Structures are given as structure tokens and as C-alpha cells.
Amino acid sequence: MLLTHPSSPRAAQALARKLGNAACFIAGGTLLQQSWAEPRLAPSATHFINVMHWPEMQQISLGPQYLHIGAGMRLEAVRRHPWVQQHAPVLVQALAQLGAMGIRRLGTLGGNIGWGEGDCCPVLLATDAQVELTDGNLQSLAQTLKLMDRPLMLSFLLPRSDVTEPRPLVFEKVGYRAAFSPARLRMALRWSDAQKRLNLDRIAAAAPGIGVHRLQATEKLLSYAQELQIRPSLDDIRTTCEQSLPPDLARIASRLIAGHCGLLA
């Protein structure tokens, strides 16, 4: 095993490109250790790149339009930060359900998002979060997560609640550790206005082995139903969910969506 401490985020990204598949960014390492054959023995063929020694990745700030959260921020520090509580309360709710305190104190937001299946992923995807990359450019999180080789992410930008009027947003996690069962499904739902009902324009979901993504077929179904003022059935919603989720998870997702849209009464 090799561990390198690059001088800057740009140098880290350049090294990762040079090493190719052998490269692996590491921060808290809480997720990486779960994939190792021996939890305390890192794979010898992997070249780890430490990303936890640059101040710019470990701070939270307010810009004119966005809340900036450094990718190297510890999960528990993000959860407790007053600006995050003010501008991203649903992210705080998701973080409160994420693992044990020891995990939250060690793991980072960048690691959770980079994994693509973490609790924070649906929330940030549903809020149209942006990512700051090492070249200084901004990219939508949706676009970043589609890349096979995900770049090093410096920070995440979320809309400020005192600049952009917040839209109704909820987070759902089915089967979490408080019930001593592994999480089966993580979802975030966002409505276009305070009336809620069928005005659901963002449905983001992730599950073990299934990267976070939007359920666009379901979004289109609800938009069509809202336009025509018709009531979609639970079976209609489940069928659209099955376009990207296995049947058992599609059943769970469809009931959550229908319930939040007032379609189960």
C-alpha cells in the first residue's frame, strides 16, 4: 500500500489521472474499509491519495447565492453547523440518521457523496446541488455522479434559503440502524411549490448497489397527471419506479411517493 500527500487538490487530481485504476482518494476511510477483505489491512495494489490536509476542503461559508460546504468536512460537523441547519435542514435530518456517532465524526461529506449511495446523495441531488472541482469550475452534482471516474470534489454548493425561496423537501430512509436493519432505500422528494400534492418535480433515490439517481419516469407521470388534473394510481407510480428500481424497492418507493402526495387516502 502506498499513501501520498499531494501539495494541492490540483496535484491530487493530476496524480489520480496518472495512476488510473490504482488511485483511490481517501479521507475518513469509513466506507473504504468496508470493502477490504481484511478491515485493518489496506489492499497492497492501491495507491491512496490523502485529501484531508487542505484547509479549503474543510470549511463552510456563505456566498451571495449558495451555502458552500467543503467536501472534507466531517459529517457530524456538517450536521451541527448553524448555517447548514438554517439553509439545509433536510440535509441535517439525513445526517442524523447516518450511522453511529463514531462514523459521523470520522466520515466526510465528500466520501458519502463520492460513494454514490450515501444518505446525503438523494438530498443534494434533489436540491440541484453543484460541485466545485479542482480546476475551479462548477458542475451539477447530477453530471458529476454520472462520470465513471469521479473527479476530486472540493465543495458542494446548495441554494441559500434566504436568497432562493425554499421548496418543500423531505427525506425518507427505509430500514435504518435504529431498527437494527441495513438501509434498503434512501429517497428525497422535492415539490415545486408549497401546495405539494402532485407538484413533485424531484424524486431522487439510492439503495445498496444502486447509485443515486432521479426517478424521471415517475416525475413525468406526476407532472402529466397534474397537468390533466387526474389522479394516478399506486400501480401507475409503482410501474414507473420499476424502470430504475427492482420490484421490491419500487413497491416501497411508490408507497412513499403516493403517501407524500396524498394519494393513499
Enumerate the predicted regions with their spans.
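C-terminal structural segment of proteins
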Residues: 1-265
